[in-house]
A protein has these predicted regions:
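Bulky hydrophobic/aromatic "packing anchor" residues in well-ordered structure
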Residues: 52, 121-124
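C-terminal segment of classical bacterial N-terminal signal peptides
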Residues: 16-25
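Bacterial N-terminal signal peptides that target proteins for export
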Residues: 1-12
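Short, charged beta-turn/beta-strand-edge "cap" motif at the junction between a beta-strand
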Residues: 79-81, 148-151
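A structural feature that tracks compact, well-ordered secondary-structure segments
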Residues: 83-86, 146
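Acidic/histidine-rich, surface-exposed loop or edge segments in extracytoplasmic proteins
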Residues: 46-55
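Boundary regions of SH3-family modules and the immediately adjacent low-complexity/disordered segments
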Residues: 29-42, 57, 65, 74, ...
Length: 179
């Protein structure tokens, strides 16, 4: 009997996936936080002094302090008016939502820091791999993102602007498009 129940459940699950109902809908709902916004999602730090706490509230200890406004962080969880964030180094903790902004920024290839002197992320005039390079960004450089088309992001940094491959930045998901 147990074998039949398993087999019936398996057939039902496969049918639900193939018809686009059930499991797919549950996943779409699970991707939204209590705020109604998607989880995870990228935002930036609004203030130049932001305490990262070990839990969602001022009663929790501060584990880190960010000292630069505009840094990109990823919201991975929500609780009341607190957001659990992850930074480009993988550090996680909680911050009050009032210290976050919907503005977008990214860090050029933080995973390439310290890999050598001639490692750069090319910023291009157009969103094409053959387009003219307008700047060479060192890994770890902060850029402000204006839009992404799913493969490329239009970004600005001190004295330069252009298109950067989404695969070479931390601050936009692969395939994510926005203006």
């Amino acid at each position: 009997m147990r074998h039949r129940v398993f087999r019936s459940s398996l057939i039902l699950a496969v049918a639900m996936v193939l018809t686009g109902s059930g499991l797919e809908v549950a996943h779409a709902q699970a991707a939204k936080g209590p705020s109604g916004l998607p989880l995870p999602r990228f935002v930036t730090l609004k203030s130049k002094r932001v305490n990262l706490r070990i839990g969602p509230g001022t009663d929790y200890a501060t584990s880190w302090m960010y000292m630069k406004a505009g840094l990109p962080v990823e919201i991975v969880q929500e609780y009341d008016n607190w957001r659990q964030i992850r930074d480009a180094d993988g550090t996680e903790g909680w911050v009050n939502q009032s210290l976050l902004s919907g503005s977008r920024a990214a860090i050029a290839a933080p995973w390439m820091k310290g890999k050598g002197k001639n490692v750069f992320v090319n910023m291009r005039r157009d969103a094409l791999p053959s387009s003219t390079v307008t700047a060479k960004l060192e890994p770890g450089v902060l850029v402000h993102i204006k839009e992404c088309n799913g493969n490329w992001c239009f970004a600005k940094t001190d004295g330069a602007e252009g298109w950067v491959a989404q695969s070479e930045i931390w601050g936009a998901y692969p395939g994510e498009a926005f203006k």
